Amino acid sequence: MYKKYIFLLGLLLPLSLFAQNFSKGSVVDENNTPLIGADVYWEGTQIGTSTDNEGAFTLKRPEGSSTLVVSYVGYKKKTVKVSDNTPLHIQLEPETTLEEVVVSYKRANTMKSQWQVADVHTMSSGELLKAACCNLSESFSTNPSIDVNFSDAVTGNKQIKMLGLTSPYILMAEENNPTMRGASQAYGLSFVPGTWIESIQITKGAGSVINGYESISGQINYEIEKPISAIPFFLNLYASEDNRYEINAHTNKKLSDKWATTLFAHGNVRQQKADHNHDGFIDNPIGNQINLLNRWQYADAQKGWVGFLNLHYMKDERQAGELRFNPLTDKGTTNAWGSEVNSERFSVSNKIGYVFPDTPHKSIGLQNSFQSHKQDSYFGLNRYDIHQKSWYGNLIYNSIITNTKHKFATGLNGTYDDYNEMLSTMALTGDFSRVDRSVGAFFEYTYDNLSNFSFVAGVRADSHNHLGNFITPRLHVRYNPWKQATFRVSAGRGKRAANVIAENQQLLASAREFTIVGGDGGKLYGLNPEIAWNYGVSFLQAFKVLGKNAEFSIDFYRTDFDNQVVVDLDNSPQQALFYNLNGNSFANSLQAEFSITPAKGLDFKAAYKYYDVQTQFTKGQLEKTLTPKHRWFANVAYETPERHENNHSQWKFDVTFNWLGEQRLPTTATNPVVYRLSDYAPSFATLNAQITKVFSKTFEIYVGGENITNYKQENGILATNDPFGAYFDSTMQYAPAFGQMYYAGLRFKIL
C-alpha cells in the first residue's frame, strides 16, 4: 500500500507547476473570523473548492468565467464579480443574524459540500438544537447518518452508532481535540449541552491522520460558540412531563477589539420518580447536573494570531433502580436493587494559532488539553470506580509545495492517560489501573487541481507503550464527473485500546458474570489492541425538480477487523465474555438520502439505511445484536415568513419519523420460559414533533412531543421480580421503555 502512495504522489507532484490563471482569497464571517470549509465555485461550472483551516482558497479560473459563488451553512450565499487576480476578501452575512442562527431550531441548517475531499456533513446549531433540552447525545435525532439508542433500560444513557459500529469506534473531538475517551466514553455525550455548540462536522469513514490513529468508523467534531461572535446574553428554560427541568444561560463580554470571554452555565434536575409501565423500576434516572464553562478568545487578524483558553467543570449525579430503592438504607444490600453513577470532570485546554501575514497559506498551531474525569458508581451489588487523568498535545504546521495546488500539514502529537480503575463483582474483582503513553508524527499531503479533482494522502507513525510501534495510512479522493455531482472514495486504518469495562459498564446492570479470556499475551486486560480497515465510496448529486432545489446522495462503507475485542452475550444469558477475535468481523453500511425544498420555508428529507454487521462468536458467525438491518427516516420542516412589521414574528414546525426493522437479541434460550425473549425484536416506529412561536428576535416559546406513536417495549428488564437472581438483565433495550413525552420551554436573548 505504501508503494502505491509513493507512486501516486510521484505522479501528481510535478503536475501544473507552472503559472496558471487563478483566483485566491479568504472567506470570513461578519466578525472577520475565517470560515473553514466554505464552498467556493465559478458560477455555471463544476470548478470549485472549499476553504482551508485559515478560510483561504485558491481556484483555477476558466476562460470566460467572472463570477464566484460562495456559500456556507447558516450564511447567505454570495456572488462576487472577479475582474483580475487581486486577492479577494469575501465576508458572508448570516441568513438572519448570527444570534438567530445560534438559537434557531430549524432543520435546514445542514450542508454536504461538493468540494471537500472527505465525506463531511456539517450541522449548524439550527439542526443541533432540534430537541429543546438537548445535549450532544440528543442532537442527532434529525440526522439519518447517526443512530441513537438507549444502552440499557435502567440508566437511561444514550449511545450513538455510525456505520453500524458503536461510539468507541468513533473519534469524538471538541474543536479537533480528542475527547470522550476511556472513562467518559459511556456518559460523555450527555455532558455537552446542545446550546453551547456552534456546529458539528460528521466525517464518515477514515478520518484525518492529524487527529490521531483511533478513528475507525468516522469522526464527530463539535465547535463551541466563539466569544468574539457570541451575543451578550442567552437563556433557555425547559420542562417536560417526565419531570425533567433544565436551564441554559450564556453571558458574553467583549473586553476589547481583540479580547472576549463567554461564561456558559447549564443545570438540569429530575427528582420525582415515575413508573408508568408498572415493572417496579423507575422509567428515568433521577438526579442533577451542574455544568460550567469559561471560554476566552484572543484574535488579532492583522498580526495573524488567534488563541483560545477553556476552563470547564461538570458534576453529574444520577440514581436508578427500583421505585422503592433508598440509597441511604439499601446501598450494598439486597433490600432493593439500585444504582448510582456520580461523575465529576474538570478540564483546561488552550489553542494557539499563527498565520504568517505575508504568506497566508503558511500557519502553525499548538493545542494542549488536560482532563480529569472521576466516576464512582455501583449497579446493585456490582461496584465500578474509575479516575482518568489525561493530557493531549498537538503541534501542526501547514504550508504549500511550490504552489497552492500542493498543500501539506505535518506535526507531532502525544497523549498520556493515567487510569485508576477498580471493579468488584461476584465473578470478577480487581485493580485494572494502567498508564498509556504515546507519541506520534504525521504528514498529510493535499492535491487539488483547482477544478474537479483532489485527494488527501496521509500517514502517521506512533509509538505506544501498550500498542507498540505502528503506521497508520489514510486516503481520501474527490472527483466531480459532471455538473453538481461529487464522487468520493476513502480508505484507512485505525488502531485503538479497548477499555473493556468502561465501554461496557451497562452490562453491570444485569446478573451477567464478566469473564475476560486472554491468553495471547495482550497488555490491555490480557487482550490485544483492536485493528480495523475502513473503505468507503459515496456519490452526491444536486439537481432541480420542477425548479426546486433537490439533492440525492448514496454511500457504502465497509469495516474489516484484523482484531476486535469481542463482547459475547450469546454464550450464556448469565455471562458476558470478552475475548480476541478468532475469525471474521465486519460491518457493511449502505445509506441513500433524498432532500428537497418544494416551497419557500418548506424542507423535506428522507433516507433509507441498511446494515450488515457480523462477528465470529464462540457459537459461530452471528449478526451483531441490537442493530436493525433496515431503517427508514423522514423529516418535514416548515417556517412561515417572518413578519417584519410585527417584530419578525413567525411560526416553525418540525416532524421527524423513524422506522426501525427487526433486531437480533442476545440469546435467552436457556432461561426459564418466563424469562425468555424471542430471537428477534419486532420492528417499530416513532414520531417526534416540535412547534415554535417566535414573538420577536429576542423571545420565543416552544412545545414538542417525543415518541408520539406511543410505542413501548414490553419486558425491557428481565426478572424485575428477582433483581438479585440469576436471570435479571436490563440490557435488552431495543426501543423506548416509556410512551409519549411532551415538553415546553422558552428562549430569550439580548442582542
Language-model-detected regions and their locations in the chain:
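Short, acidic, small-residue-rich periplasmic hinge/interaction motif at the N-terminus
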Residues: 28-33, 38-43, 71-75, 83-129, ...
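Short acidic/polar hinge/loop motifs at secondary-structure boundaries
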Residues: 57-60, 159, 177-204, 292
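Extracytoplasmic beta-strand/coil segments of soluble accessory domains associated
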Residues: 60, 137-178
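N-terminal periplasmic accessory domains that precede
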Residues: 85-91, 136-139, 158-161, 187-193, ...
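Flexible loop and strand-edge segments within Gram-negative outer membrane beta-barrel domains
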Residues: 270-291, 297-364, 370-388
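Membrane-embedded beta-barrel scaffold of Gram-negative outer-membrane proteins
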Residues: 363-377, 480, 488, 525-580, ...
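Gram-negative outer-membrane beta-barrel transporters
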Residues: 448, 553-560, 580-666
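C-terminal beta-signal and adjacent terminal beta-strands/loops
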Residues: 495, 562, 659-668, 692-751
